[in-house]
Amino acid sequence: MNTLLAVLMLAVAAQARPDAAGHVNIAEAVQQLNHTIVNAAHELHETLGLPTPDEALNLLTEQANAFKTKIAEVTTSLKQEAEKHQGSVAEQLNRFARNLNNSIHDAATSAQPADQLNSLQSALTNVGHQWQTSQPRPSVAQEAWAPVQSALQEAAEKTKEAAANLQNSIQSAVQKPAN
């Protein structure tokens, strides 16, 4: 901490210029140094090609919206499957859809793309297992589960791909050599 303070004091002293009367305005020198540091940080940020906080938030929001759209498609598919089968199968599909939607919502609200992917994969595994074990007639369950499983697999693959793309773009931006 003392070293940092000494460096800052040295920087202020180097930045300070006496006025016509020979006086040094330390506050003005500190303000100029702060301005220089802020400009250097912005230039470094631009040189590395890093997204601004707003851009990063927009990317994550875009990913979350795409994820929610896919979930809506899967939920619609689940409801269509539920309409094909009456009674207990329809009830189980509705419960399955609610559990899936809740699990995916939890995954989509995770802060990190890797966390989203892990939560989604866990949710898909858990909900798929619940569906398969709760069905009293395995042949009906497997028949109803096949299109749902396909849609879930597609959603998982697209989410994994989107998370990987986002992670790669962030890593390449961070690793981009300064010109």
Swiss-Prot record:
The keyword Translocase does not apply. Residues 165-179 have a biased composition (Polar residues). Keywords: Glycoprotein, Lipid transport, Repeat, Secreted, Signal, Transport. Sequence repeats lie at residues 30-40, 41-52, 53-60, 61-78, 79-89, 90-99, 100-113, 114-127, 128-140, 141-151, 152-165, 166-179. GO terms for biological process: lipid transport. Residues 1-16 form the signal peptide. Residues 152-179 are annotated as: Disordered. Glycans are attached at N34, N101. Hemolymph. It is found in: Secreted. One of its GO terms (cellular component) is extracellular region. The keyword Thylakoid does not apply. Equilibrium between a soluble monomer and a bound lipoprotein form. Apolipophorin-3 associates with lipophorin during lipid loading until each particle contains 14 molecules of apolipophorin-3 in L.migratoria (5 molecules of apolipophorin-3a and 9 of apolipophorin-3b). Belongs to the insect apolipophorin-3 family. Assists in the loading of diacylglycerol, generated from triacylglycerol stores in the fat body through the action of adipokinetic hormone, into lipophorin, the hemolymph lipoprotein. It increases the lipid carrying capacity of lipophorin by covering the expanding hydrophobic surface resulting from diacylglycerol uptake. It thus plays a critical role in the transport of lipids during flight in several species of insects. Two isoforms of apolipophorin-3 (a and b) have been found and occur in a ratio of 5a:9b in the hemolymph. This is Apolipophorin-3b. It comes from Locusta migratoria.
